[in-house]
UniProtKB/Swiss-Prot annotation:
Protein known as: Protein PELPK1
Organism field: Arabidopsis thaliana (Mouse-ear cress)
Main subcellular location of this protein, as a coarse class: secreted
Stretches the record annotates as 52 X 5 AA tandem repeat of P-[DEGQ]-[AEFLIV]-[QPT]-K: 43-365
Function: Positive regulator of germination and plant growth.
Ranges of Basic and acidic residues composition bias in the record: 65-223, 232-262, 271-296, 306-334
Amino acid sequence: MALMKKSLSAALLSSPLLIICLIALLADPFSVGARRLLEDPKPEIPKLPELPKFEVPKLPEFPKPELPKLPEFPKPELPKIPEIPKPELPKVPEIPKPEETKLPDIPKLELPKFPEIPKPELPKMPEIPKPELPKVPEIQKPELPKMPEIPKPELPKFPEIPKPDLPKFPENSKPEVPKLMETEKPEAPKVPEIPKPELPKLPEVPKLEAPKVPEIQKPELPKMPELPKMPEIQKPELPKLPEVPKLEAPKVPEIQKPELPKMPELPKMPEIQKPELPKMPEIQKPELPKVPEVPKPELPTVPEVPKSEAPKFPEIPKPELPKIPEVPKPELPKVPEITKPAVPEIPKPELPTMPQLPKLPEFPKVPGTP
């Protein structure tokens, strides 16, 4: 019994709801928490029973159907497609050249003729004969001496190495391709031909003729009046100047040069003979011993192995492109060149040249004067 009382007291004290209720009853003013608990008790949400999990039923494993192995068919050889000739392009029609428009002839203006001025003739220079060069005698080339022919050494012959025969492989016969059953193609239904409606014929429209334009007459140019001829301009004659007599230089007396005294001749120095050097005896050079020539060993020649020739591929001819005809360019009409009138040159009058006065002769300087 004692144990039961202890367990009940312990259970009451351990529950938080009973403790809150006791505190609310003992206290004079009710607390907000106690009021809420007493007035608005929360409804308990009923727990739904746990539904068993839906297990997906396992499907039985079906054995995979094995595909039957198809026999390997050898690849059929494709038939050779015949070469399709290229269609020739139609020739472009030649475009006619446009006719050149003829320009009216422009009459040239006639210029007045001026008198011709004669050109002064140059004096002829005498011809200078070319000096003849002496002939050089031909020098004969010396003939080179003929060298004796050196016989070539014979190489040792090697035996030929026979090529090993390659084993022959049997030819693989190609398997015959089984003939497939020919399936008849279904015939297409015939479509009835629909007759084309005939178009109504249009009346021919007469071409309008262009009205003829009256020819316009060219106005005649008025004739230029003839210019009077220019009178010849006479060259003015130069006035003759009086001759100026040449001044004769006064004769200066000749001054004799003083004779220099002769220097006495110096006596000749006697010749000093050079002492002769004693002759040194000639030292003979020692002769070196001759080294015997060692013959070079001849190398054996390796037989040439023929190279395998690469297979030649047939050349594929390039297709020729059709030539496009050249379209000629229309030529433009040439405009006539208008020549400019040449202006005559007026000769300049020559000025009279002044005569040169003769230079005065220079007098010789007298020694002793500044």
